[in-house]
Amino acid sequence: VDLHQHRLDLALELGATHVLDGRAADLVAQVHAITGGGANYSFDTTGVPAVMQNALAALRMTGVCGYVGVQVGNLELDGLALVGKTAIGILEGSADPQTFIPEMIRWWQEGRFPFDRLIERYPMSQINEAEQSSLSGGTIKPVLIPS
C-alpha cells in the first residue's frame, strides 16, 4: 500500500503479489478481499493516525499489526477493531542487533534484501532536500551521510 505509483511498481518488481493505492476509499475492504478475510500481519511506518487505524482494521482475527512510525500525542483506535488482534510498537526491528544486522547483510549478499534500491544517500548539508524528497515520495528512505 502506498500513495506513489513508482513505489508500488518497485514493490511488484521486488516480489509483492498485490499493490494497492493508499488513497482508495475501500482500502480495508480490498485487503480483506485479497486475503480472504484480512491479513495475518500488517505494518505501518507512517505514524499517520488514519493509516495506523487502517493497518489494524485490515487484519483478520488473531492478526498482528506492527507500528514503526509514531507521532507525539494520543492515538485513538477503535476498540472493536483491536478485539482479537495484537498491536505492537517496534523499535529498531525489535531484534537483537548482534544477530539481526549480520542476518540482513547476508540477505543483501544473497540478493534477498535489496536495501540499496530502497535508500538514497544525502550529505548532511542536504537534510532539507532529503526530508522533502521523502515527504513527496521521491525517496523511500533517505540516509544522511555526515560530512
Give residue ranges: language-model regions:
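Adenosine-nucleotide cofactor-binding segment
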Residues: V1-N54
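Short beta->alpha linker loops
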Residues: D2-L3, G22-D26, T46-G47, V70-Q71, ...
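Short, hinge-like loop/turn segments at secondary-structure boundaries
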Residues: G15-L20, A29, G37, L82-T86, ...
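Structural motif
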Residues: H18, N40-Y41, G63-G66, T86, ...
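Conserved beta-strand scaffold positions in the cores of enzyme catalytic domains, especially
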Residues: V19, A87-G89, L118-R121
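C-terminal hydrophobic helical "lid"/dimerization subdomain
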Residues: A25, G37, Q53-A57, Q98-S147
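Glycine-rich phosphate-binding loop and adjacent beta-alpha segment
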Residues: P49-R112, P146-S147
